[in-house]
């Protein structure tokens, strides 16, 4: 870590995310689940459906159809538990996806036996993150004590009033008590959560730090070494035969795909009334054609659809067929108009 003084590049962070090493603040997900769970339970949970189910059983003197009863129990279960469970699952998934920018950790499923290394395990025990978690646990215990105290001071009258409440009133009282204790805890925890977030982010960025050699290596991988790129351009020219170079020089224009197909168009009304295909090249040769055409001043026009059509329907040194003649002539006329304006 002594030599890792450079901030991580976007590529480094993206590659780390694919390995499951993206920044994820787990406490944020926990807080969202608690809040969503609390308010959905208070909003959707009701004992009235349960009471109606029991009332139906008692009215029928416990002589009911087992299949219908099972179906009714399932419906009541999903009405009471289904909605809170759905929203809790959603609140667990969405914050994680947002934090990871919807990048799936495709490389994280690979087995890594290095995690079984006892030396690494020992280092984790005495790591900064472990110390941070220790102090965080102490703070949360203090917060729990404060929550209990203030909850008791604020809601003790309501707690004792349950003795005089009806069944429906009990549900409302429990809902309020549940909401109050959750909100008290989150209110006292907010500073700890923010501080924990900042420390977690700093530790994550520290783990992602790069040395200058890593940055240089990444740059070469992405951009390619200058000498390598120069040599590659030379090879593109070398793979063209003299005949192909001559065909390029004599062409009116070259229609490009732009990187996989190159179609040369020759047109001279004094020799032939219709344009014909002077060359057809693909892949590396197509790139070489574009490079050489630019060097000798032959226009290259990017038209993906036309290039694909001509490649599929024509051969080298064949006249453009009637079906594609209009498109090719329009392109030639447009090119002449552009040249005349300059």
Curated annotation (Swiss-Prot):
GO CC annotations, alphabetized = plasma membrane
Keywords for the protein's UniProt record, in alphabetical order: Cell inner membrane, Cell membrane, Membrane, Plasmid, Transmembrane, Transmembrane helix, Virulence
Q: What is its main location?
A: membrane
Where do transmembrane segments lie in this chain? Answer: 28-48, 70-90, 133-153, 158-178, 181-201, 260-280
**Which GO biological process categories is it annotated with?**
protein secretion
Q: Where in the cell is it found?
A: Cell inner membrane
Q: How does it sit in the membrane?
A: Multi-pass membrane protein
A Pfam family assignment: Bac_export_2
Q: Is tRNA-binding given among the entry's keywords?
A: no
Q: Which PANTHER family match?
A: FLAGELLAR BIOSYNTHETIC PROTEIN FLHB, SURFACE PRESENTATION OF ANTIGENS PROTEIN SPAS
Q: Name the job this protein performs.
A: Required for surface presentation of invasion plasmid antigens. Could play a role in preserving the translocation competence of the ipa antigens. Required for invasion and for secretion of the three ipa proteins.
Tell me which family the UniProt entry assigns to this protein: Belongs to the type III secretion exporter family.
The name under which this protein is listed is Surface presentation of antigens protein SpaS
Organism of provenance: Shigella flexneri
